[in-house]
Protein backbone atom coordinates (compact mmCIF):
# COMPACT_ATOMS: atom_id res chain seq x y z
CA UNK A 1 0.00 0.00 0.00
CA UNK A 2 1.34 3.43 -0.93
CA UNK A 3 2.28 5.68 1.97
CA UNK A 4 -0.19 8.51 2.51
CA UNK A 5 1.44 11.89 2.07
CA UNK A 6 1.19 14.08 5.16
CA UNK A 7 -0.81 17.24 4.54
CA UNK A 8 1.21 20.22 5.70
CA UNK A 9 -1.88 22.39 5.50
CA UNK A 10 -2.95 21.41 9.02
CA UNK A 11 -1.57 23.29 12.02
CA UNK A 12 1.43 21.51 13.55
CA UNK A 13 1.82 20.64 17.26
CA UNK A 14 4.72 18.97 19.09
CA UNK A 15 3.66 16.56 21.80
CA UNK A 16 5.18 13.86 24.00
CA UNK A 17 4.31 11.08 26.45
CA UNK A 18 5.56 11.52 30.04
CA UNK A 19 5.08 9.51 33.24
CA UNK A 20 6.52 6.79 35.49
CA UNK A 21 8.53 3.84 34.16
CA UNK A 22 6.35 0.88 33.04
CA UNK A 23 3.09 2.83 33.20
CA UNK A 24 2.68 2.34 29.44
CA UNK A 25 4.06 5.44 27.69
CA UNK A 26 5.57 3.52 24.77
CA UNK A 27 2.57 1.16 24.46
CA UNK A 28 0.30 4.21 24.31
CA UNK A 29 2.48 5.83 21.63
CA UNK A 30 2.27 2.62 19.55
CA UNK A 31 -1.50 2.38 20.17
CA UNK A 32 -2.08 5.95 18.94
CA UNK A 33 -0.29 5.20 15.63
CA UNK A 34 -2.11 1.88 15.19
CA UNK A 35 -5.59 3.33 15.86
CA UNK A 36 -5.01 6.43 13.71
CA UNK A 37 -3.54 4.30 10.89
CA UNK A 38 -7.03 2.83 10.38
CA UNK A 39 -8.28 6.21 9.18
CA UNK A 40 -5.08 7.00 7.25
CA UNK A 41 -3.76 9.46 9.84
CA UNK A 42 -0.56 7.60 10.69
CA UNK A 43 1.81 4.84 9.82
CA UNK A 44 1.27 2.02 12.32
CA UNK A 45 4.42 1.77 14.43
CA UNK A 46 5.02 -1.25 16.67
CA UNK A 47 6.16 -1.05 20.30
CA UNK A 48 9.63 -2.50 19.51
CA UNK A 49 10.26 0.09 16.79
CA UNK A 50 9.55 2.92 19.24
CA UNK A 51 11.40 1.28 22.13
CA UNK A 52 14.62 0.99 20.08
CA UNK A 53 14.98 4.77 20.13
CA UNK A 54 18.03 6.17 18.33
CA UNK A 55 20.54 8.29 20.24
CA UNK A 56 20.75 11.96 19.38
CA UNK A 57 23.13 14.66 20.49
CA UNK A 58 21.72 17.95 21.75
CA UNK A 59 24.10 20.62 23.11
CA UNK A 60 26.76 17.98 23.77
CA UNK A 61 24.43 15.59 25.58
CA UNK A 62 23.42 12.18 24.25
CA UNK A 63 19.69 11.51 24.52
CA UNK A 64 17.60 8.61 23.26
CA UNK A 65 14.28 9.73 21.82
CA UNK A 66 11.81 8.10 19.48
CA UNK A 67 9.80 10.29 17.12
CA UNK A 68 6.54 9.31 15.43
CA UNK A 69 4.17 11.51 13.47
CA UNK A 70 0.45 11.28 13.00
CA UNK A 71 -2.55 13.43 12.25
CA UNK A 72 -6.10 13.86 13.48
CA UNK A 73 -8.76 15.57 11.41
CA UNK A 74 -7.70 18.93 12.88
CA UNK A 75 -3.94 18.78 13.35
CA UNK A 76 -0.59 17.27 12.44
CA UNK A 77 1.45 16.00 15.41
CA UNK A 78 5.11 15.18 16.00
CA UNK A 79 5.21 12.90 19.04
CA UNK A 80 8.29 12.14 21.14
CA UNK A 81 8.71 9.17 23.49
CA UNK A 82 11.84 8.42 25.56
CA UNK A 83 12.91 4.96 26.70
CA UNK A 84 14.50 5.86 30.03
CA UNK A 85 13.79 8.26 32.88
CA UNK A 86 17.17 10.00 32.51
CA UNK A 87 16.36 10.61 28.82
CA UNK A 88 13.17 12.43 29.84
CA UNK A 89 15.00 14.65 32.30
CA UNK A 90 17.65 15.53 29.70
CA UNK A 91 15.09 15.96 26.94
CA UNK A 92 12.89 18.35 28.87
CA UNK A 93 15.77 20.44 30.21
CA UNK A 94 17.69 20.75 26.91
CA UNK A 95 14.51 21.23 24.89
CA UNK A 96 15.87 18.64 22.45
CA UNK A 97 12.28 17.80 21.63
CA UNK A 98 10.21 20.92 22.15
CA UNK A 99 6.83 20.06 23.69
CA UNK A 100 3.77 22.23 23.07
CA UNK A 101 1.83 19.82 25.25
CA UNK A 102 2.16 16.45 26.95
CA UNK A 103 0.18 13.26 27.56
CA UNK A 104 0.79 12.17 31.15
CA UNK A 105 0.43 8.39 31.39
CA UNK A 106 -0.55 6.99 34.81
CA UNK A 107 -1.19 3.32 35.52
CA UNK A 108 -4.62 2.89 37.12
CA UNK A 109 -3.23 -0.14 38.96
CA UNK A 110 -0.39 1.82 40.65
CA UNK A 111 -1.56 5.42 40.78
CA UNK A 112 0.93 8.32 40.76
CA UNK A 113 4.55 7.26 41.44
CA UNK A 114 7.82 9.21 42.07
CA UNK A 115 8.59 9.79 38.37
CA UNK A 116 4.97 10.89 37.79
CA UNK A 117 5.67 13.71 40.25
CA UNK A 118 9.08 14.49 38.81
CA UNK A 119 7.80 14.69 35.22
CA UNK A 120 4.91 16.99 36.24
CA UNK A 121 7.34 19.25 38.12
CA UNK A 122 9.79 19.27 35.20
CA UNK A 123 6.98 20.05 32.75
CA UNK A 124 6.05 23.04 34.93
CA UNK A 125 9.68 24.20 35.28
CA UNK A 126 10.48 24.04 31.56
CA UNK A 127 7.18 25.63 30.56
CA UNK A 128 5.14 22.82 28.94
CA UNK A 129 1.89 24.81 28.58
CA UNK A 130 -0.73 22.07 28.93
CA UNK A 131 -1.21 18.35 29.47
CA UNK A 132 -3.88 15.69 29.14
CA UNK A 133 -3.92 12.53 31.30
CA UNK A 134 -4.30 8.96 30.07
CA UNK A 135 -5.22 6.63 32.94
CA UNK A 136 -3.83 3.40 31.52
CA UNK A 137 -4.33 -0.30 32.40
CA UNK A 138 -7.95 0.19 33.56
CA UNK A 139 -8.56 -3.40 32.42
CA UNK A 140 -6.49 -4.49 35.46
CA UNK A 141 -8.71 -2.65 37.97
CA UNK A 142 -12.13 -4.12 38.81
CA UNK A 143 -13.06 -1.64 41.52
CA UNK A 144 -14.57 1.61 40.18
CA UNK A 145 -14.04 3.32 43.58
CA UNK A 146 -10.32 2.64 43.24
CA UNK A 147 -10.31 4.24 39.77
CA UNK A 148 -12.01 7.33 41.20
CA UNK A 149 -9.44 7.49 43.97
CA UNK A 150 -6.53 7.34 41.50
CA UNK A 151 -8.15 10.06 39.40
CA UNK A 152 -8.49 12.29 42.49
CA UNK A 153 -4.84 11.68 43.40
CA UNK A 154 -3.70 12.63 39.89
CA UNK A 155 -5.80 15.83 39.93
CA UNK A 156 -4.41 16.83 43.36
CA UNK A 157 -0.85 16.21 42.18
CA UNK A 158 -1.36 18.33 39.04
CA UNK A 159 -2.83 21.19 41.10
CA UNK A 160 0.04 20.97 43.60
CA UNK A 161 2.52 21.70 40.80
CA UNK A 162 0.57 24.59 39.32
CA UNK A 163 -1.47 22.88 36.58
CA UNK A 164 -5.30 23.26 36.58
CA UNK A 165 -5.94 19.80 38.09
CA UNK A 166 -9.74 20.21 38.13
CA UNK A 167 -9.97 21.08 34.42
CA UNK A 168 -7.45 18.71 32.83
CA UNK A 169 -9.14 15.97 30.79
CA UNK A 170 -8.47 12.48 32.18
CA UNK A 171 -9.18 9.66 29.72
CA UNK A 172 -9.48 6.12 31.09
CA UNK A 173 -8.41 3.25 28.87
CA UNK A 174 -6.01 0.44 28.09
CA UNK A 175 -3.22 0.84 25.55
CA UNK A 176 -2.90 -2.94 25.47
CA UNK A 177 -6.57 -3.41 24.49
CA UNK A 178 -6.09 -0.82 21.74
CA UNK A 179 -3.01 -2.67 20.47
CA UNK A 180 -5.08 -5.88 20.43
CA UNK A 181 -7.74 -4.10 18.35
CA UNK A 182 -10.50 -4.35 21.00
CA UNK A 183 -13.28 -1.78 20.42
CA UNK A 184 -13.19 -0.36 23.98
CA UNK A 185 -9.41 0.06 23.67
CA UNK A 186 -9.72 1.94 20.38
CA UNK A 187 -12.58 4.08 21.69
CA UNK A 188 -10.36 5.34 24.54
CA UNK A 189 -7.55 6.26 22.10
CA UNK A 190 -9.99 8.24 19.94
CA UNK A 191 -11.30 10.01 23.06
CA UNK A 192 -7.73 10.81 24.07
CA UNK A 193 -6.92 12.33 20.68
CA UNK A 194 -10.11 14.42 20.79
CA UNK A 195 -9.02 15.72 24.20
CA UNK A 196 -5.51 16.50 22.91
CA UNK A 197 -6.99 18.29 19.87
CA UNK A 198 -9.30 20.47 21.93
CA UNK A 199 -7.40 20.99 25.21
CA UNK A 200 -3.80 21.55 24.11
CA UNK A 201 -3.61 25.10 22.74
CA UNK A 202 -2.22 25.84 19.29
CA UNK A 203 1.33 27.19 19.83
CA UNK A 204 2.21 30.73 18.75
CA UNK A 205 4.31 30.45 15.60
CA UNK A 206 7.87 31.78 15.77
CA UNK A 207 7.11 34.43 13.14
CA UNK A 208 4.27 35.85 15.30
CA UNK A 209 6.57 36.47 18.29
CA UNK A 210 8.63 39.68 18.71
CA UNK A 211 11.77 39.92 16.55
CA UNK A 212 14.95 38.44 18.09
CA UNK A 213 18.27 37.51 16.49
CA UNK A 214 21.34 36.34 18.42
CA UNK A 215 24.48 38.00 16.99
CA UNK A 216 27.03 35.50 15.71
CA UNK A 217 29.43 37.77 13.84
CA UNK A 218 30.10 41.47 13.22
CA UNK A 219 31.67 43.06 10.11
CA UNK A 220 32.23 46.63 9.05
CA UNK A 221 31.69 47.59 5.43
CA UNK A 222 33.61 50.73 4.49
CA UNK A 223 31.21 53.59 3.99
CA UNK A 224 28.18 51.38 4.71
CA UNK A 225 28.23 51.08 8.50
CA UNK A 226 28.16 47.76 10.37
CA UNK A 227 26.68 44.37 9.46
CA UNK A 228 25.78 41.74 12.06
CA UNK A 229 24.99 38.17 11.07
CA UNK A 230 22.96 35.42 12.72
CA UNK A 231 19.89 33.24 12.49
CA UNK A 232 16.60 34.96 13.25
CA UNK A 233 15.16 33.13 16.29
CA UNK A 234 11.70 34.71 16.26
CA UNK A 235 9.62 37.37 14.59
CA UNK A 236 10.23 39.41 11.44
CA UNK A 237 12.63 42.31 10.79
CA UNK A 238 11.81 44.84 8.07
CA UNK A 239 14.15 47.42 6.54
CA UNK A 240 13.70 50.78 8.29
CA UNK A 241 12.57 49.36 11.65
CA UNK A 242 14.08 50.45 14.96
CA UNK A 243 15.81 47.69 16.92
CA UNK A 244 17.69 47.34 20.19
CA UNK A 245 21.09 45.73 20.79
CA UNK A 246 20.70 43.91 24.12
CA UNK A 247 23.10 42.14 26.51
CA UNK A 248 26.70 42.35 27.81
CA UNK A 249 26.62 46.20 27.81
CA UNK A 250 24.04 48.96 28.11
CA UNK A 251 21.13 48.52 25.66
CA UNK A 252 21.55 50.64 22.50
CA UNK A 253 18.96 51.68 19.93
CA UNK A 254 19.69 51.51 16.21
CA UNK A 255 17.86 51.14 12.88
CA UNK A 256 17.95 48.28 10.40
CA UNK A 257 18.95 49.79 7.04
CA UNK A 258 19.22 46.53 5.13
CA UNK A 259 18.66 42.77 5.28
CA UNK A 260 20.88 40.44 3.23
CA UNK A 261 20.59 36.72 2.65
CA UNK A 262 22.93 34.75 0.36
CA UNK A 263 24.36 38.12 -0.82
CA UNK A 264 20.93 39.28 -1.99
CA UNK A 265 19.08 42.26 -0.52
CA UNK A 266 15.68 41.52 1.03
CA UNK A 267 12.86 43.69 2.37
CA UNK A 268 12.60 41.55 5.49
CA UNK A 269 14.11 38.60 7.36
CA UNK A 270 12.00 36.14 9.33
CA UNK A 271 12.31 33.36 11.93
CA UNK A 272 14.64 30.64 10.63
CA UNK A 273 16.51 32.85 8.12
CA UNK A 274 20.30 33.21 8.29
CA UNK A 275 20.77 36.90 7.55
CA UNK A 276 23.10 39.85 7.65
CA UNK A 277 21.54 43.01 9.06
CA UNK A 278 22.95 46.47 8.33
CA UNK A 279 22.84 48.81 11.32
CA UNK A 280 22.68 52.60 10.90
CA UNK A 281 25.32 54.62 12.76
CA UNK A 282 26.53 51.69 14.87
CA UNK A 283 30.31 51.31 15.09
CA UNK A 284 31.97 47.92 14.68
CA UNK A 285 33.35 47.99 18.26
CA UNK A 286 29.93 48.78 19.79
CA UNK A 287 28.48 45.36 18.92
CA UNK A 288 29.74 41.85 19.72
CA UNK A 289 28.89 38.20 19.48
CA UNK A 290 26.63 37.16 22.36
CA UNK A 291 24.39 40.20 22.18
CA UNK A 292 20.99 40.03 20.49
CA UNK A 293 19.08 42.30 18.13
CA UNK A 294 15.50 42.63 19.33
CA UNK A 295 12.27 44.52 18.94
CA UNK A 296 12.51 47.54 21.29
CA UNK A 297 11.27 46.75 24.81
CA UNK A 298 10.67 43.05 24.10
CA UNK A 299 13.63 41.61 26.07
CA UNK A 300 15.85 42.90 28.87
CA UNK A 301 19.37 41.99 30.02
CA UNK A 302 19.64 40.11 33.34
CA UNK A 303 22.50 38.65 35.38
CA UNK A 304 20.66 36.77 38.18
CA UNK A 305 18.29 33.88 37.61
CA UNK A 306 17.06 30.53 38.89
CA UNK A 307 17.58 27.44 36.75
CA UNK A 308 16.69 23.78 36.44
CA UNK A 309 19.84 21.95 35.36
CA UNK A 310 20.91 18.46 34.31
CA UNK A 311 24.55 17.73 35.21
CA UNK A 312 26.32 15.28 32.91
CA UNK A 313 27.59 12.04 34.41
CA UNK A 314 31.25 11.04 34.15
CA UNK A 315 30.30 8.46 31.44
CA UNK A 316 28.70 11.23 29.36
CA UNK A 317 31.94 13.23 29.41
CA UNK A 318 30.93 15.38 32.38
CA UNK A 319 32.72 16.11 35.64
CA UNK A 320 34.16 13.25 37.68
CA UNK A 321 33.46 14.96 41.00
CA UNK A 322 30.50 16.84 42.50
CA UNK A 323 30.45 20.65 42.63
CA UNK A 324 29.59 22.76 45.67
CA UNK A 325 28.29 26.26 46.39
CA UNK A 326 30.13 29.13 44.61
CA UNK A 327 31.24 26.87 41.71
CA UNK A 328 32.22 29.20 38.79
CA UNK A 329 31.86 27.65 35.33
CA UNK A 330 30.99 29.28 31.97
CA UNK A 331 27.33 29.59 30.96
CA UNK A 332 26.81 29.35 27.20
CA UNK A 333 23.75 31.35 26.07
CA UNK A 334 22.83 31.26 22.37
CA UNK A 335 26.20 32.31 20.90
CA UNK A 336 28.57 33.07 23.78
CA UNK A 337 30.05 32.02 27.12
CA UNK A 338 29.68 34.16 30.26
CA UNK A 339 31.26 33.28 33.62
CA UNK A 340 28.82 32.87 36.49
CA UNK A 341 28.67 31.74 40.12
CA UNK A 342 26.30 29.00 41.25
CA UNK A 343 24.44 29.45 44.57
CA UNK A 344 22.95 26.19 45.83
CA UNK A 345 19.80 26.12 47.99
CA UNK A 346 20.49 26.06 51.76
CA UNK A 347 19.58 22.37 52.09
CA UNK A 348 21.94 21.23 49.33
CA UNK A 349 25.66 20.79 50.01
CA UNK A 350 26.69 19.53 46.57
CA UNK A 351 25.46 18.41 43.14
CA UNK A 352 26.64 15.04 41.83
CA UNK A 353 27.39 14.23 38.16
CA UNK A 354 24.21 12.65 36.68
CA UNK A 355 21.85 14.67 38.94
CA UNK A 356 19.28 17.24 38.03
CA UNK A 357 19.11 20.23 40.37
CA UNK A 358 17.58 23.67 40.92
CA UNK A 359 19.85 26.59 41.86
CA UNK A 360 20.54 30.31 41.41
CA UNK A 361 23.18 31.75 39.06
CA UNK A 362 24.88 35.16 39.13
CA UNK A 363 26.60 36.11 35.84
CA UNK A 364 29.49 38.60 35.63
CA UNK A 365 27.78 40.29 32.64
CA UNK A 366 24.05 40.52 31.85
CA UNK A 367 22.56 38.48 28.99
CA UNK A 368 19.31 39.12 27.09
CA UNK A 369 17.06 36.50 28.65
CA UNK A 370 13.51 35.44 29.29
CA UNK A 371 12.10 32.51 31.25
CA UNK A 372 12.43 29.30 29.27
CA UNK A 373 15.81 30.24 27.74
CA UNK A 374 18.12 27.23 27.39
CA UNK A 375 21.85 27.24 28.14
CA UNK A 376 24.83 24.92 28.54
CA UNK A 377 27.32 24.85 31.39
CA UNK A 378 30.90 24.49 30.22
CA UNK A 379 34.26 24.00 31.83
CA UNK A 380 37.41 24.42 29.75
CA UNK A 381 35.40 24.20 26.52
CA UNK A 382 33.56 20.95 27.29
CA UNK A 383 29.90 20.69 28.23
CA UNK A 384 29.29 19.61 31.84
CA UNK A 385 25.59 20.46 32.11
CA UNK A 386 22.48 21.82 30.42
CA UNK A 387 19.84 24.06 31.90
CA UNK A 388 16.79 26.21 31.44
CA UNK A 389 16.01 29.60 33.04
CA UNK A 390 12.97 29.07 35.30
CA UNK A 391 12.81 32.49 37.01
CA UNK A 392 14.54 35.85 36.57
CA UNK A 393 15.60 37.48 39.84
CA UNK A 394 16.53 41.08 39.09
From Swiss-Prot:
It is found in: Cytoplasm. GO terms for cellular component: cytoplasm. It holds the Pfam family GTP_EFTU_D3. Residues 136-139 are annotated as: G4. InterPro entries: EF-Tu_GTP-bd, EF-Tu_GTPase, EFTu-like_2, EFTU_2, G_TR_CS, P-loop_NTPase, Small_GTP-bd, T_Tr_GTP-bd_dom. SUPFAM superfamilies: EF-Tu/eEF-1alpha/eIF2-gamma C-terminal domain (SSF50465), P-loop containing nucleoside triphosphate hydrolases (SSF52540), Translation proteins (SSF50447). Residues 174-176 are annotated as: G5. Residues 19-26 are annotated as: G1. Monomer. This is Elongation factor Tu. It comes from Rickettsia parkeri. The lineage of its organism: Bacteria, Pseudomonadati, Pseudomonadota, Alphaproteobacteria, Rickettsiales.
Amino acid sequence: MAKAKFERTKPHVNIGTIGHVDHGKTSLTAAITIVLAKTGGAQATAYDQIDAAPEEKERGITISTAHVEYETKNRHYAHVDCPGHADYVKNMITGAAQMDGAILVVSAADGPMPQTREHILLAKQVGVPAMVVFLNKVDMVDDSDLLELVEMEVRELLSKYGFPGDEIPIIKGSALQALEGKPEGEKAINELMDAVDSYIPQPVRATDKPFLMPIEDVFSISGRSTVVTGRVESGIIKVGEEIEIVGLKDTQKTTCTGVEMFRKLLDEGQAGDNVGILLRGTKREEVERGQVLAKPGSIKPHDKFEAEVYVLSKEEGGRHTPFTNDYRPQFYFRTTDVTGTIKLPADKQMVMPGDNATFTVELIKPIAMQEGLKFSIREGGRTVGAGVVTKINN
